[in-house]
């Protein structure tokens, strides 16, 4: 496995792969890899000739009071894990390599970025699109791999791929969970022992809301059940729990067929997200 830190070295490798008519799978990450990331890489390994994993904690997607400086980092560990699942090339640039100049052109994520996580993290998805677009241009992937846990991010990146005519296929891999249902996340390391015991209630709440909505079609009732469960079972603070048409991220209507049930909850100081995407077979 090769590890590269410069754009020049990366693009030379990508051009050689393209000249050899190899398919390229890109797995973008911010590092501190967990089983969810490794599942993305394993899926990419099964479908491509060359698997590229980026490891870059992207400053443009963090707000001024967020955890950019404290975000967990362990590049040697990540490199070993990436190699263990068959990644061919790790691209781990510095901030200066990716953003050599302040200012310049920026991508605006649009209306899809003003709700859910975007409501409490203004500018977050602009930063996500900025780095993902750069990675797409640099790696020229045949396929790009993302996790369902970041469902809003996936929807917004899919819109960018469509609108900017990126010639690639989006691959979305299901959420990987702990045995008690908690979605795997690099931020789970922040949780204290007692907070970790409470955190699975988020997934439980989404299951309750999903069952309620499928039984009654009542959005308010479903969300109320989810909120009540979190309030009873945890000391957490709810950022949002919403039920929307997916991938449009618009209000549910009688013709909605696919639904996103998404939550963000602060357990202690740690903001955790989770979701469920499911089909309403006959519409509402």
Curated annotation (Swiss-Prot):
This is Pantothenate synthetase. The keyword ATP-binding applies. CDD domains: PanC (cd00560). ATP binds at residues 30-37, 147-150, 176, 184-187. InterPro entries: Cyt_trans-like, Pantoate_ligase, Pantoate_ligase_C, Rossmann-like_a/b/a_fold. GO terms for biological process: pantothenate biosynthetic process. The active site is at 37 (proton donor). Pathway: Cofactor biosynthesis; (R)-pantothenate biosynthesis; (R)-pantothenate from (R)-pantoate and beta-alanine: step 1/1. It comes from Lysinibacillus sphaericus (strain C3-41). It is found in: Cytoplasm. Keywords: ATP-binding, Cytoplasm, Ligase, Nucleotide-binding, Pantothenate biosynthesis. Belongs to the pantothenate synthetase family. It catalyses: (R)-pantoate + beta-alanine + ATP = (R)-pantothenate + AMP + diphosphate + H(+). The reaction proceeds by a bi uni uni bi ping pong mechanism. One of its GO terms (cellular component) is cytosol. It comes from the Bacteria. Gene3D superfamilies: HUPs, Pantoate-beta-alanine ligase, C-terminal domain. Disulfide bonds: none annotated. The keyword Ion transport does not apply. Homodimer. GO terms for molecular function: ATP binding; pantoate-beta-alanine ligase activity. Beta-alanine binds at residue 61. Catalyzes the condensation of pantoate with beta-alanine in an ATP-dependent reaction via a pantoyl-adenylate intermediate.
């Amino acid at each position: 496995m090769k590890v590269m830190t410069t754009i020049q070295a990366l693009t030379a490798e990508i051009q050689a792969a393209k000249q050899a008519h190899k398919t390229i799978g890109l797995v973008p990450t911010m590092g501190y890899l967990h089983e969810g990331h490794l599942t993305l890489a394993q899926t990419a390994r099964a479908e491509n000739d060359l698997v590229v994993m980026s490891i870059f904690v992207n400053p443009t997607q963090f707000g001024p009071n967020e955890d950019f400086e404290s975000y967990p980092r362990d590049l040697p560990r990540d490199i070993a894990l990436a190699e263990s699942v068959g990644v061919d090339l790790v691209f781990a640039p510095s901030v200066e390599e990716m953003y050599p100049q302040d200012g310049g052109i920026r991508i605006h994520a649009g209306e899809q970025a003003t709700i859910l996580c975007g409501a409490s993290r203004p500018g977050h998805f602009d930063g996500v699109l900025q780095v993902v677009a750069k990675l797409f241009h640099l790696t020229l992937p045949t396929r790009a791999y993302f996790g369902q846990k970041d469902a809003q991010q996936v929807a917004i990146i899919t819109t960018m791929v469509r609108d900017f005519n990126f010639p690639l296929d989006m691959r979305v891999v299901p959420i990987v969970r702990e045995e008690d249902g908690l979605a795997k996340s690099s931020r789970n390391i922040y949780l204290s022992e007692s907070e970790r015991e409470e955190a699975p209630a988020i997934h439980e709440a989404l299951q309750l809301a999903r069952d309620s909505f499928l039984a009654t079609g009542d959005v308010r009732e479903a969300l109320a059940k989810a909120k009540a469960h979190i309030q009873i079972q945890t000391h957490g603070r709810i950022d949002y729990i919403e039920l929307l048409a997916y991938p449009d991220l618009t209000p549910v209507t009688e013709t909605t067929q696919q639904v996103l049930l998404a939550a963000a909850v602060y357990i202690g100081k740690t903001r955790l997200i989770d979701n469920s995407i499911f089909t309403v077979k006959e519409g509402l």
